[in-house]
C-alpha cells in the first residue's frame, strides 16, 4: 500500500516507448533473435511503469540485462530524476578515434598500441608513471566533491590509461573514404566510475524506500533537485572528463611512440573525436516550464549535438564486432530515435550460451578463433582466447545496419575497415600475464 506522498508504479501501457528493432524470419539465428526481442520488450514493458519515466526507446542492438530494467540498447527519459542503474557501473563507457593519416601502416600502429595499452582488472603499477597524466584541475574537482574519497582519487590516478576487460577493445583500421589509418579505443571509467556507481545506488535506494517503495531496487533514482542529486550530477561530469582523459592518454602514448603530431603539446587536434554510449544527459522540459529531463542511454549512442558539449562535426562511432567496420555516423533527433543510435551489434544470447553452442561443434577454442578471425589481426592481451568476444557472439552486423537505416537512426558517413584489434582475452590469462 502506498501513502499519498509516495509515487506508485504507473499503470501498464501508461507510457509507451519506441521499438526500433525487428526480427528477420529468414535469419539463420531467428530463434535466438525472436527470444531476445521478446525479452527486451518484456523488460521495457515493466520498466516504463517506473513513475519518473516519460519516454523510452530501444535500439536494434538491444539485449536484456535483467527483469524489468533497462536493456543494453535502451533509452529512457526521466523527469527530475537520475537513475544510476540506467547508466550502469561502467559509467561513460565510450569510444574515441584518432586518425593517424597514411604515414604509418596499420600493423605498425597496432604493434605500438599493444606495447602501451593495458587490459585486465585493476590499474597500472605506480612505477609506470601514467598517474602523472591526471590534470590538476581534475584532481581538484575530485577532491572537492563529497561523493569521492581518497581511495577514489587513487583509482583515478592508477586506472588512467587502462581499458579493463569484457567487450572493451583497441581497434586499428583504415578509413573507407580516404584510407587513413585510425585507432579506436573502447572502454569506460574503470574502478573510478564503478565506485561512484555503488555509492549512487545506495543513495537512490534510500530515496526509493521513502518516495516509491513499489519501484524495483534496480530502478531507484536520486531526485535531481536535491543536494544529493546536484552532487551526483557534478560527479558524473567529473567521471566523464576523466574517461575522456583515459582515452586520450592511450592515444597520446601511441602518437608519441609513432612520432606522430596528431597531438600538439599533448592536446588533441581535429584528428580525434569521441562519444560516450553509457551516460545520462540533461535537457529542459518540452515547454521550458517544468523540471529538467534526464535522458539515460545504456548502450545507446547520442546523435543529437545538444547532448555532447565537445562534439566534433557531429561525428559518432558505432562499432559492430572485430571483423566488421566501425561505422562513423551523424544524425539528429527524430520522431523515432529520441536523439540516439545503436552503440554496436549487441547480442542475442549470453556469453555462456554462446560458448556452449560454439564448442558443441567439437572445435577447439583455437580452431574457432582461427576460423572467425581469418583476414584480421586479432590479438588477446592476455594471450588466452575468449571466444565470447569473437564475431559470432554478436548479432548480425548487416541486419543492425539495415535496421539503423529503416528506423532513421543516423546516417553512415564513413566506415573504418578493420585491420586488427586487441581485447583482454581469458580473464585468468589476463591476471597471469600482467606486466604494467
Q: How does the language model describe each region?
A:
Residues 97:
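N-terminal glycine-rich flavin-associated loop
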Residues 118-147:
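Acidic low-complexity segments
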Residues 100-102:
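Acidic, low-complexity central loop/insert segments
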Residues 2-44, 51-59, 64-72, 76-88, ...:
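Domain-length cofactor-binding catalytic modules of enzymes
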Amino acid at each position: 500500500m502506498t501513502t499519498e506522498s509516495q509515487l506508485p508504479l504507473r499503470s501498464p501501457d501508461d507510457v509507451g516507448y519506441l521499438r526500433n528493432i525487428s526480427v528477420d524470419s529468414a535469419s539463420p539465428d531467428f530463434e535466438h533473435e525472436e527470444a531476445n526481442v521478446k525479452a527486451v520488450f518484456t523488460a521495457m514493458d515493466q520498466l516504463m511503469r517506473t513513475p519518473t519515466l516519460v519516454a523510452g526507446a530501444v535500439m536494434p542492438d538491444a539485449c536484456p540485462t535483467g527483469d524489468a530494467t533497462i536493456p543494453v540498447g535502451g533509452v529512457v527519459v526521466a523527469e527530475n530524476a537520475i537513475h544510476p542503474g540506467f547508466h550502469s557501473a561502467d559509467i561513460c563507457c565510450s569510444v574515441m578515434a584518432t586518425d593517424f593519416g597514411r604515414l604509418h601502416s596499420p600493423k605498425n600502429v597496432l604493434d605500438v598500441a599493444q606495447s602501451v595499452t593495458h587490459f585486465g582488472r585493476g590499474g597500472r603499477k605506480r612505477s609506470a608513471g601514467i598517474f602523472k597524466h591526471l590534470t590538476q584541475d581534475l584532481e581538484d574537482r575530485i577532491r572537492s566533491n563529497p561523493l569521492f574519497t581518497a581511495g577514489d582519487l587513487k583509482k583515478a590516478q592508477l586506472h588512467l590509461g587502462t581499458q579493463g576487460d569484457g567487450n572493451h577493445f583497441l581497434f586499428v583500421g583504415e578509413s573507407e573514404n580516404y584510407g587513413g589509418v585510425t585507432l579506436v579505443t573502447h572502454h569506460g571509467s574503470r574502478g573510478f566510475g564503478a565506485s561512484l556507481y555503488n555509492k549512487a545506488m545506495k543513495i537512490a535506494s534510500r530515496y526509493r524506500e521513502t518516495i516509491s517503495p513499489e519501484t524495483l531496487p534496480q530502478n531507484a533514482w536520486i531526485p535531481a533537485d536535491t543536494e544529493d542529486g546536484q552532487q551526483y550530477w557534478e560527479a558524473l561530469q567529473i567521471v566523464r572528463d576523466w574517461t575522456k582523459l583515459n582515452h586520450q592518454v592511450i592515444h597520446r602514448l601511441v602518437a608519441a611512440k609513432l612520432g606522430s603530431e596528431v597531438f600538439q603539446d599533448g592536446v588533441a587536434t581535429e584528428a580525434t573525436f569521441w562519444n560516450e554510449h553509457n551516460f545520462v544527459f540533461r535537457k529542459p522540459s518540452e515547454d521550458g516550464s517544468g523540471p529538467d529531463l534526464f535522458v539515460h542511454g545504456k548502450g545507446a549512442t547520442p546523435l543529437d549535438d545538444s547532448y555532447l558539449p565537445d562534439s566534433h562535426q557531429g561525428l559518432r562511432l558505432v562499432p559492430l564486432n572485430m571483423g566488421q567496420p566501425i561505422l562513423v555516423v551523424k544524425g539528429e533527433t527524430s520522431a523515432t530515435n529520441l536523439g540516439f543510435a545503436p552503440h554496436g551489434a549487441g547480442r542475442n544470447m549470453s556469453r555462456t550460451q554462446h560458448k556452449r553452442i560454439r564448442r558443441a561443434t567439437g572445435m577447439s577454442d583455437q580452431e574457432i578463433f582461427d576460423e572467425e578471425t581469418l583476414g584480421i589481426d586479432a590479438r588477446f592481451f592476455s594471450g588466452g582466447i575468449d571466444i565470447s568476444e569473437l564475431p559470432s557472439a554478436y548479432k548480425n552486423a548487416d541486419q543492425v545496419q539495415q535496421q539503423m537505416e529503416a528506423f532513421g537512426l543516423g546516417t553512415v558517413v564513413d566506415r573504418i575497415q578493420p585491420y586488427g584489434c586487441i581485447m583482454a582475452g581469458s580473464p585468468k590469462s589476463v591476471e597471469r600475464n600482467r606486466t604494467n
